[in-house]
Every structure is written in structure tokens, then in C-alpha cells.
Amino acid sequence: MDLVIGGKFKLGKKIGSGSFGELYLGVNVQTGEEVAVKLENVKTKHPQLHYESKLYMLLQGGSGIPNIKWFGVEGDYSVMVIDLLGPSLEDLFNYCNRKLTLKTVLMLADQLLNRVEFMHTRGFLHRDIKPDNFLMGLGRKANQVYIIDFGLGKKYRDLQTHKHIPYRENKNLTGTARYASVNTHLGVEQSRRDDLESLGYVLMYFLKGSLPWQGLKAGTKKQKYDRISEKKVSTPIEVLCKNQPSEFVSYFHYCRSLRFDDKPDYSYLKRLFRDLFIREGYQFDYVFDWTVLKYPQIGSSSGSSSRTRHHTTAKPGFNADPIERQERILGKETTRYKIPGAVEAFSRRHPTTTSSPRDRSRSRNSDDGPFSKQTHGDSERANSSSRYRASSSRKAVAASSSRPSSAGGPSESRTSSRLVSSSGGGGSGSGNGRPSTSQRVQAGYESKTLSFSRATAARNTREDQLRSFELLSLRK
């Protein structure tokens, strides 16, 4: 396809595709910069690229949000041009033989929670949290996680009044069945709690290599979703998190205890994992499992192995010098990936060499970066042409509650609901001022004695700029 987009972006080879379009490599003919170009036929039955581009514009400036460079129509296609990114976490998970160490998962968890929290502060849910939708950056941003694919995103509150969307049931399953929350399976309208529960499943997937409801056989897609739902509901949190630190049990109990319109305490969840990270003696040096596999000398230099703790004289934790040792070894090596076959292509294009002088930037959770995507056959994503409607026999049990939310502002809706239990019992908290699980309700059920303190949300400084998008046509 010989096409120049917007007068300056030349279309290259196809690098990915999904249920909502195709992804191409592109290049800015004026600067030589490589970009990602997402195409969607204007005649598609359920167009969403224009909607997705609006969400990208709303989220611009956030850490781990790709820059949108151009959107418009070229011939028969709606086109969005954004930053080119590296491999997805699914690609890297496969590269690491489908299991990640606790250290790598905890380093990722901190960034992933930040990405989800940022979307929520902008008034939107993602609704398709999965490893394929988190990509690593390129070059100096190679250690930064980016969140992509906002086509299923939904506004959950009015940007001016902060009024929360109403509680509803009998909703179709939106997202990817493997990582969908229990209440999403049961047809309950999604809210912030559901993105966080999905993120918890992603973390357990990384740690354990698979989830209990993977590989279930069924005759139709609906029957498969039914089986996944039944298995997910019947698996106690303690069984799901067996042989993993208790912080993951606490994470799930917290997420499932949130009411529909509750504002999650993101700081509490991040603190759970940060305290565990420090207690394990790890260094936040951005030496991920895939870094060690690609550059074994980094692992030995940093005093870590891919499956053990860091033993170092430096004080463990998040304040340690991030990638100084990695800089010395990598020198000016530009970490460059392509999708699909991201890591393999990277290995072919960049043989391990350590002769260059140090010039690697310290990549913390800073600003922007690039883009790319791969769709995996086992993702079980429910697209708009085949939605799953929860059967009435497993409908969520709803009950109105007038208990004021301790986290939401006065303008947030007080309508809430009881969730359907999907856990076999409580866990235990992990100390350090964090609430124990005994203070929490049984997983999935609401409690009038719920007493978590909520962090007061900072006033959105960009509200005025965002109001121009208030007329944005949003998903039902």
C-alpha cells in the first residue's frame, strides 16, 4: 500500500492487526522518525478509531501515554498516527518462557497501577486491561510502560460535575474474557474497580504462567465465556493466589470489596506492592527478566539473577539508583523492538555488544513515548459483532445503599450495589498500617462497616482544556 498520510507520513509494512483495524509501520518523510499508523476502513460496521483518537487526545501529556501525531481520513480509511512503541508485555512474557519473577512483576505493577490511575483521573475506564495493551517504550524510554488501545474506553463520570454513571445490569461483556472482572461476567456495568481487578489477573498471569480458567473447551464463544465465568466465580482468591505473597490476596479482596462508584485507594494498592518489594530486598534498577535474558552480564553486574533476590550493599527499595549499572554495560545501545516477533527481531538487529561508552538515559515514569500492537489468538476478546450477554441465572444481586463513599467527592453518585462473591474466604493484611483482610468484607460482598480511608483526589488541572470534548459521543 503506497500511501502518504497527512502529507508527511509514508506507510510501510504491516506490523499488526486486531478486531478493530490494522497497524502499519510508518515514517515521517520530513524527519525520518518512525511512527505507528493505525488504519480502519470507513465502511466498517462498528467504527471506533475516531473515538479512540479522541481519548488519546484527552490523555495527552500523561506518563506512558503515546503521542498522537495525526488523525484524519485518507481515501477509504480513517487513519491515526501515533508514536511507535516496543514489544507488548505479552511478547516479553513469551520471550521469558511464560513466567516472570516476582521482582519483575512488582516493578511492572507500580507502573501499571499508575497508568490505570491516570486514565481514571481523566474520567475514563479502559475496559480491556490485558498484557497485549501494555507496551514498553523504545530507546531511552525502553523501561517505561505505555498503555494503548482505548477503543473500548468509556467515560465513567462527567468531567464538569463529576457525577458518576448509573449502576446498571444485563450489560454485554466488553473486553477480554480471560481478564474480565467477576462483575463484568455477571453483566454489571463496569467502573473503576473492574479495571483494577483485571489488572490483578494480569499480575497473577505473569507470576503463575496461566490462569485457572484458561484452556477451557466449549462449542460456541458464548459457552466458552460461560465456562470462564463459572470457573472464575468458583475459584477462591486464596486458591488463585496460592504460593504467592499475601499482598496479592489483599489486592483482590480490596478490589472486590469496592462499591460500584467508589474511588479506589490507588496509593494503598501501590504501597502494598512497594512494601513487598522492599521487604524482599530488591533494587528498583529496571533490570527486568527480559533484560537479563538478552544481556546476562547486566544480571551478574547488578548482583541479581533472574529468579533470586538482589543481594547488595545499597539500601533496597524504590529510591535506589535505577539503571546506573545497566547504563555502563549497554552503553549507547538503543533498545529497539519491532512487532510482531518483537524480541526476536530485536535480537537479530542488535547483537550483544558492550563496547560503546555509557549514554543510556535513566528512564523513570516520565513523559511520552511510541506505539505498536499485536493481537493474540488466545485473547478471547469480545468484539462488537459477538457480545456475550450474561444469563439471568447468574445475574449480580443488586441492593441500593445510601452509605456515603469516603473517597468520592460530594458530587459522585451514592448509588451502589452488592457484588456477587467469587472467593472462598478472607486473607490477611500485611501490616505497616495497611488494613488487614479481616477488616475487609468477604470478597465480592459489600459491608456497611467498610472503613478504608480514601486518598482525596487532586483537582484536575486540565479540566478546562478537556471540556471541549464533553460532547464526545460515548459508548452505551
Curated annotation (Swiss-Prot):
Positions with biased composition (Gly residues): 423-432
Segments forming domain Protein kinase: 9-278
Region called Disordered, residue ranges: 299-324, 340-464
Active site feature: D128 (proton acceptor)
Family matches, as InterPro entries: CK1_Ser-Thr_kinase, Kinase-like_dom_sf, Prot_kinase_dom, Protein_kinase_ATP_BS, Ser/Thr_kinase_AS
Alphabetized SMART domains for the sequence: S_TKc (SM00220)
Catalytic activity: L-seryl-[protein] + ATP = O-phospho-L-seryl-[protein] + ADP + H(+); L-threonyl-[protein] + ATP = O-phospho-L-threonyl-[protein] + ADP + H(+)
The protein's enzyme class: transferase
Protein family: Belongs to the protein kinase superfamily. CK1 Ser/Thr protein kinase family. Casein kinase I subfamily.
Protein name stated in the entry: Casein kinase 1-like protein 7
UniProt organism field: Arabidopsis thaliana (Mouse-ear cress)
